[in-house]
């Protein structure tokens, strides 16, 4: 048995908390249904994101990023506090040969055109810029909960009403089992190909195989069996704004209980009515 297959067997056989009923609270399902409708009606939004993501075995320092987003995937990112303070990023499908326009905001500062899926662009982010948005986050949560519910596994619980960032919110929690599969990497493939074929996040696949010393999509070799988790997280905690019906915070944990993603959404405003200037590097408010 190869290493990946053995690891998956161990993962599936690992002791867990005592078995609980596959509980899906009506209040939580209603909150997710309202969230789905709100996301479908979101044409653009602005917010201040605070994120912390797992790097190796430690959470990276907090990053504060101002975001403008517009369908289908126009996006402007400006890091206002954190390790890359001053950095600005622009991306739009079909523009700039589908590359990021980036400048780091510190000396020596110059514009770069960057592959959004390349190791440099992915060095400090779990998610490639073409796949970053609040709407995609909602889709990810809904997809995982629906698939678990359909298989009568996992849980979705209503945890009550709270106040977060001065906003009334509903808190829900979801769990999913540590199931998965082990496809074999073919010649010329990377983990991006496995991610595309399976519909799983490349980061989640990379994290599941961390014991093998892989820290980039191109590290595994042809013939390697790759652990691909069926679900994005072992546990997620979601705070949904009671007025906007969109997430204002989410915490995602792996199946060993480690927090690997924490996202806060501050000053969220939807359907702003952005113009092409908001995604133009020539905008005088930007420093490209």
What do the predicted segments below correspond to?
Residues 175-202, 224:
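Primarily a LysM-type cell-wall glycan-binding module
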Residues 196, 201-232:
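Extracellular LysM carbohydrate-binding repeats and other cell-envelope/extracellular binding modules
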Residues 6-12:
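Hydrophobic helical h-region of N-terminal Sec-dependent signal peptides
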Residues 19-33, 37-43, 51, 59, ...:
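Flexible, processing/modification-adjacent segments and terminal tails
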Residues 164-167, 218, 230-238, 242-288:
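Acidic, serine/threonine-rich low-complexity disordered tracts
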Residues 35, 63-68, 89-90, 157-162, ...:
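Hydrophobic/aromatic beta-strand elements that line small-molecule binding cavities or substrate pockets
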Residues 48-54, 173-178, 253:
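Generic short beta-strand segments
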Residues 68-71, 92-95, 189, 233-248:
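A short, surface-exposed beta-strand/turn
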């Amino acid at each position: 048995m190869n290493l990946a297959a053995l690891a998956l067997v161990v993962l599936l056989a690992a002791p867990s908390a005592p078995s609980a009923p596959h509980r899906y609270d009506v209040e939580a399902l209603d909150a997710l249904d309202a969230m789905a409708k709100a996301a479908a009606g979101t044409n653009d939004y602005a917010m201040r994101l605070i994120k912390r993501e797992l790097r190796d075995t430690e959470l990276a320092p907090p990053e504060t990023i101002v975001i403008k987003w517009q369908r289908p995937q126009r996006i402007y990112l400006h890091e206002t506090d954190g390790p890359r303070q001053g950095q600005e990023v622009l991306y739009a499908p079909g523009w700039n040969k589908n590359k990021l326009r980036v400048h780091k905001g510190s000396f020596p500062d110059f514009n770069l055109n960057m592959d959004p899926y390349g190791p440099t662009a992915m060095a400090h982010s779990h998610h490639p810029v073409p796949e970053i948005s609040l709407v995609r986050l909602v889709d990810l949560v809904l997809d995982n909960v629906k698939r678990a519910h359909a298989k009568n596994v996992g849980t979705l619980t209503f945890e009550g009403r709270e106040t977060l960032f001065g906003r009334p919110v509903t808190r829900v929690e979801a769990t999913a089992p540590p199931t998965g599969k082990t496809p074999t990497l073919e010649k010329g493939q990377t983990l991006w190909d496995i991610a595309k074929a399976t519909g799983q996040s490349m980061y989640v696949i990379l994290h599941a195989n961390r014991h093998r010393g892989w820290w980039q999509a191109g590290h595994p070799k042809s013939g390697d069996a790759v652990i691909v988790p069926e679900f994005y997280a072992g546990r997620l905690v979601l705070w949904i704004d009671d007025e906007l019906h969109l997430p204002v915070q989410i915490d995602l944990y792996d199946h060993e209980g480690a927090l690997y993603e924490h996202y806060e959404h501050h000053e969220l405003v939807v359907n702003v009515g952005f113009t092409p200037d908001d995604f133009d590097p020539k905008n005088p408010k930007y420093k490209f």
